Design a protein with these regions (language model features):
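Catalytic-loop region of hydrolases
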Residues: 15, 19-118, 123-126, 384
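Accessory cap/linker subdomain of secreted extracellular hydrolases
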Residues: 38-74, 255-350, 367-370, 376
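Short, surface-exposed "cap/lid" segments of acyl-processing enzymes
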Residues: 109-173, 182-184, 368-370
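Primarily recognizes the serine-hydrolase "nucleophile elbow" in alpha/beta-hydrolase
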Residues: 205-273
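Short beta-strand/loop motif that positions the catalytic acidic residue
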Residues: 351, 357-364
Length: 422
């Protein structure tokens, strides 16, 4: 069978998910008899290799070949942020006036094990005419994907680069350098906060090594939705993990901060596809979570392990309740799940850099239907109690509209924050 392109794959996945939703699968799955049959069906389709190592079976397929993405032979002896390799990128669709380099650096995962992470540095060729060095924006994109081909460093070289909200061209027009970390890490651990923080901070360290002229640049971090996870966690972890790095500030919007809230707002609802993807992403950093997957859930995880965002989001049309796919009742209340939820709730310590948080608010119009505002306002309060300088802005719109509505204000905040550092 020929390999499907990402748009075709997304269309088929969306169609299948829609059909499942129309058929009332969400209701049917709540039947124990139906789940037994589905688990039996899935069990017969598992390979011996998948049975032998269930954790390995849900990891993303490595990018093949001996090139840039080949695993480094040995990371011992490397310091976090040390550059392993770097290469220039020529996109299939040429973009005049910019230079693109992607690089791999040493980092650590959630458990503290050495891992390689990748990032992309996009620089205007025009000389910087302002005072001081050229400003840098660390743009943490909402990758929201499980497959390595969806990482920004891979997409940008293939002319299928996606930026949501579309800040990148506006930042380059201001003659800023833009760093794009692959913040989900080498396992595409979507939604895992500590891994994302390490990937971002070590990418910044690596940037200062391949572009030493940017080492003293005023720098801000930015991210929305899945990218906000990386931004918030990097801001919180910076004083402990990378205290030598200086940031002028960080801005994050539509931030998922509390998976207990997301379990109520997304699971079994239109956001169930991305909630399921985030669950798989967390399991890649917390292998004990795989013990909770029933055979049907595990089989699905092996099927979608390389999917990008569109088909994962479209799967929400089926409105599947993940709780019924587990091997135990109320899996979200289990010690394993609660430990992961607690470990991925920011607020235990406060950032030292100024932070702007914004969110679609019912107080303005509509409100974010996927990511409840109360999680962000709680984080604002906790960080302020810890001594952080945090500004909060309630903006009109649901999750997608709020991203666009906030853009002018976010760009002004970036400009003012960067100029204040000169």
């Amino acid at each position: 069978m020929p390999k499907l392109s990402l748009p075709a794959e997304a269309a088929l996945a969306a169609a299948g998910a829609a059909a499942a939703g129309i058929a009332g699968s969400a209701t049917a799955l709540r039947s124990p008899a139906v789940m037994r049959r589905l688990n039996d069906w899935a069990s017969r389709r598992l390979t011996d290799a998948q049975r032998a190592d269930r954790y390995a079976a849900i990891l993303p397929t490595p990018l093949s070949g001996p090139g840039f993405y080949a695993d480094p032979i040995d990371l011992t002896g490397l310091v976090n942020g040390d550059v392993i390799r770097v290469e220039r990128v020529s996109p299939r669709i040429a973009v005049p006036g910019i230079s693109i380099r992607r690089f791999m650096v040493a980092s650590t995962d959630t458990a503290g094990n050495p891992v390689p992470v990748t990032a992309t540095l996009v620089e205007p060729r025009r000389p910087w005419r302002g005072s001081g060095p050229r400003p840098v924006v660390v743009r943490n994109q909402p990758i929201n994907s499980l497959g390595l081909k969806a990482a920004p460093s891979h997409r940008i070289g293939r002319g299928v680069f996606i930026d949501m909200p579309p800040f990148l061209p506006l930042l380059l027009a201001r003659n800023y350098a833009v760093l794009l970390p692959d913040h989900e890490g080498p396992r595409m651990a979507y939604s895992a906060g500590v891994m994302a923080a390490h990937a971002v901070l070590d990418s910044v360290r690596g940037m200062t090594r391949i572009a030493p002229e940017l080492a003293e640049s005023p720098t801000v971090m930015d991210g929305y939705s899945g990218g906000a996870i990386a931004t918030v966690w990097a801001a919180q972890e910076q004083p402990h993990y990378a205290p030598e790095l200086r940031f002028a500030g960080a801005v994050a919007g539509g931030t998922p901060t509390d998976y207990a809230l997301l379990h109520r707002s997304m699971n079994g609802a239109w956001g169930a596809g991305l909630f399921a993807a985030a669950t798989i992403g967390q399991a890649r950093e917390y292998p004990e979570m795989v013990e909770l997957f029933g055979d049907f859930a595990f089989h699905l995880a092996t099927l979608v392990k390389d999917y990008p965002q569109p088909p994962l989001a479209a799967a929400g049309l089926a409105r599947i309740d993940l709780d019924v796919l587990a091997v135990i009742p109320e899996p979200f209340e289990s010690p394993i799940a609660q430990a992961v939820v607690g470990a991925n709730k920011p607020g235990a310590s406060a950032p030292q850099m100024p932070v702007l948080l914004y969110h679609g608010s019912r107080s303005k119009l509509l409100g974010d239907q996927f990511i409840p505002e109360e999680g962000v306002t709680e984080l604002v309060a906790r960080w302020r109690d810890g001594g952080a300088t945090v500004e909060y802005r309630a903006v009109p719109g649901e999750h997608m509209i709020a991203a666009g509505a906030a853009m002018p204000g976010v760009l002004r905040w970036m400009r003012d924050t960067l100029e204040a550092e000169r």
